[in-house]
Amino acid sequence: MSTIENFDAHTPMMQQYLKLKAQHPEILLFYRMGDFYELFYDDAKRASQLLDISLTKRGASAGEPIPMAGIPYHAVENYLAKLVNQGESVAICEQIGDPATSKGPVERKVVRIVTPGTISDEALLQERQDNLLAAIWQDSKGFGYATLDISSGRFRLSEPADRETMAAELQRTNPAELLYAEDFAEMSLIEGRRGLRRRPLWEFEIDTARQQLNLQFGTRDLVGFGVENAPRGLCAAGCLLQYAKDTQRTTLPHIRSITMERQQDSIIMDAATRRNLEITQNLAGGAENTLASVLDCTVTPMGSRMLKRWLHMPVRDTRVLLERQQTIGALQDFTAELQPVLRQVGDLERILARLALRTARPRDLARMRHAFQQLPELRAQLENVDSAPVQALREKMGEFAELRDLLERAIIDTPPVLVRDGGVIATGYNEELDEWRALADGATDYLERLEVRERERTGLDTLKVGFNAVHGYYIQISRGQSHLAPINYMRRQTLKNAERYIIPELKEYEDKVLTSKGKALALEKQLYEELFDLLLPHLEALQQSASALAELDVLVNLAERAYTLNYTCPTFIDKPGIRITEGRHPVVEQVLNEPFIANPLNLSPQRRMLIITGPNMGGKSTYMRQTALIALMAYIGSYVPAQKVEIGPIDRIFTRVGAADDLASGRSTFMVEMTETANILHNATEYSLVLMDEIGRGTSTYDGLSLAWACAENLANKIKALTLFATHYFELTQLPEKMEGVANVHLDALEHGDTIAFMHSVQDGAASKSYGLAVAALAGVPKEVIKRARQKLRELESISPNAAATQVDGTQMSLLSVPEETSPAVEALENLDPDSLTPRQALEWIYRLKSLV
């Protein structure tokens, strides 16, 4: 890019551009030029690649052609959305001076900075997902982490103690933009994330952070927020708040408090668990066939976002959970009436954020009015619900009759997109505005009267009075009659077949009309800004109302799901344990074309580990995951897919289910598996729910079996966690005989000829057969390979003389038995082809074999 070194050689306009660009060197600068935003030099080259737009040249400056790319101002939101989705930030530079009075370039300034984590515009946001700005800080004692949803004002901080917990927080929150200090040591935690922003160290200083936060909240200290003793979290929060203020170029009145998130308040799930349980994102990265896809039939975007937050942070406070359960039960008879009305409320939460930022558009205010219009009916319907929590929500949502009346009087029914287009303020709201509009709108009548009068006065039947945007008002006479034009007609424009004229009276009226239009638009903008001033004093109450409406939407949705999907209300018990009668997988049962086979589960301190065996495809992983999902659903207060559930305290959910190579970090499948296993063994407690699926794959058979055995022993004897341990190592089925609290269960299958039918039914005891070859045949492995595999299996089974004693049906050899040396007689028989022997040779072979025994 052209530099400041040859600054004086540039044109005045480019000097202005370069000054503004120097203030924002690392982000794209959209420089307003008439009806376009233009980008120059390196910005133009980057934008042409990112947006797939043409790269051209705009004249020359300092003797060099200027690379240039441009986008129409009316389409800017679409282009901003593309850039934000790619993690880019953009400074929007507008003309603020009057071209008519400017000497030199029109005055311009950057009015806002659009970044992935600070957007609030409707067109740039995913309506059913939170969009978070985050900051991360680290010192010798651990991490500090803060998140802000600028589109709602929700401000949170936490202090993850270690790397694994920090990784889980990043996975849970998935920020659109992440600020980090220039000396941040754990770059491998955040590398590859979108929207990374390196910030100077001084922005994370604790004293600056306290000062920033107290100034924002109007407080002398932070004790009332419960964050005073969270220095690492405050360092992150201070940097984050300063960045938000810098980018928004305005106050942030909707950010009124900050909340500390503590590990002990919610069930902890690490990054692997969130991924494996497919809570809001499936393993392929999509949203289909996830828990959220089944549970989320909310009717407002803000309700959908709240439900997803609940799913990722199950609460441990049973008082909160029992209140939600009671509310869901009370609402089940009212869902059909409430959901259509709630649907009309829309995304009040984000509209209020735009109001606070003074970026709300006319249609935002119209939607706010529409939301207010639903409140009387909602409150009337809720009055009939016999539930104290529901009545508390009813009071919290308010009614706002005065604000509804204000917006009904002030804003027309269907306003334009932008206030600068005019026609936003309703007739009758302001007398002066009505007068200016009457003058501007009366032009049509005046022109018709003038045309009739001038035709009669001149006798010219081709005379017409009209208007265009370039030349203004005119009197047009055909070429054939133009020589008869009166002497007071002054020629304004010559056309091929006509002449256009102006007269003093029409010129005077034109000035008056154009002045009235300008004054009407200026007054309309002023009145629109005054509406903000009238609404903003109610912002806190409005935010509480939006929160109550979102929570009501979530609870009504969960009530509808419970009724429609035949869920039951779980019971919380004081001791560790999970007892499920006829449990079902909430997602799998929705995608199956046949009835789902429900299964029981019983975990308690006396039966704390289940060794699960059975064939591949038999349903072991489904059974394990459904247990975790039922527990998760219970701990958000939801009803669950089962006939009956009793569930005790849970502090963490761990899953070691499936794995893939982590090529980016140079870790094999086995290394990933062992890392996840180590995390479980270090952090699980007797109150944890642990899912372990086929530990020990990816290494030698004996290594794998030994690791699986030791892990199972540790979980059952030392940690005493509630554990579901699926395995194909049949030796592990001996564990119940060797230690207390361990039991065998299995999923069975039936073979008929070359076909296999999976029963998907959980039974007590160990499986008797692995069915591996049958599953391989089902998958389409060639018959000759299956045939050879059966032959090899018989050979392997014959190696151990103890195999028959270990496995009655002879289908699985004991891996812990020591193979004996093969008998020479057996070896000779294996190499013998009976069909090729003559009677004499056969007799000789009998004597030879006799000598070998």
Swiss-Prot record:
Pfam families: MutS_I, MutS_II, MutS_III, MutS_IV, MutS_V. The keyword Flavoprotein does not apply. ATP binds at G614, P615, N616, M617, G618, G619, K620, S621. GO terms for cellular component: cytosol. The keyword ATP-binding applies. PROSITE patterns: DNA_MISMATCH_REPAIR_2 (PS00486). Keywords: ATP-binding, DNA damage, DNA repair, DNA-binding, Nucleotide-binding. One of its GO terms (biological process) is mismatch repair. Transmembrane segments: none annotated. GO terms for molecular function: ATP binding; ATP-dependent DNA damage sensor activity; damaged DNA binding; mismatched DNA binding. This protein is involved in the repair of mismatches in DNA. It is possible that it carries out the mismatch recognition step. This protein has a weak ATPase activity. Belongs to the DNA mismatch repair MutS family. This is DNA mismatch repair protein MutS. The gene is mutS.
